Amino acid sequence: MKRILSFIPVHVLILFKRLGIVVLLLYVTRLIFLLFNLESFQNLTFIDFLISLWFDMITIGLFFLPYYFIYLLPIPIRGYKFHRIFFKILFHTTSILLLSLNLMDVEYFKYTSKRSTFDLFSILSAGNDFQQLISTFITDFWYLIFFLILLIVISEYLFRKTQIKFQTFTTIQKNFYKQNIIAFLLVVPGLFIIGRGGLALKPTGIIEASLYSKSENMAFI
């Protein structure tokens, strides 16, 4: 395993670790959703859990596209402070958005029997009503805010574990550009394909998930 990892550029390994953090935390929110809505999902199977994990990876492949595209650009600026700050902010902003949506579904599902993503645009277009909904949500479902804060703290702790010193323009090594260009050309398309759910002409959606799971379990996926 160490020999295989030695061929993978360090910045690519770090990217995978960071995306792995998001996979882990998203799945935690999925389990929280299940815990609070257990009566609606009595017939879940192991396949349902695997499919839900795959859809989390698809979500990350899509929402983190700006992150991994810019991060993998073959430019020796990863060692500079502004680069570290920018990507930390971008990482947490994107992950907090996804975690918040999943946690909001914990209670939203109880009232509508569907996930909030189906009604997200109509909710956002509500204007002042949306602000009122947010205020009510924070007041009535404060424990979800607690979960979110806890997950953010865990995310930051794990993110710091991935930080190391990188090459700069003054410390660049001979094979930097060759190694980084190859990594960019391989990893970015690979993650984008995951974000589409595969190589099919049409991106994978919830309809495709219904082929592998029962209709009553679709909201879990």
Language-model segment annotations:
Residues 2-220:
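Transmembrane and membrane-interface helices of multi-pass
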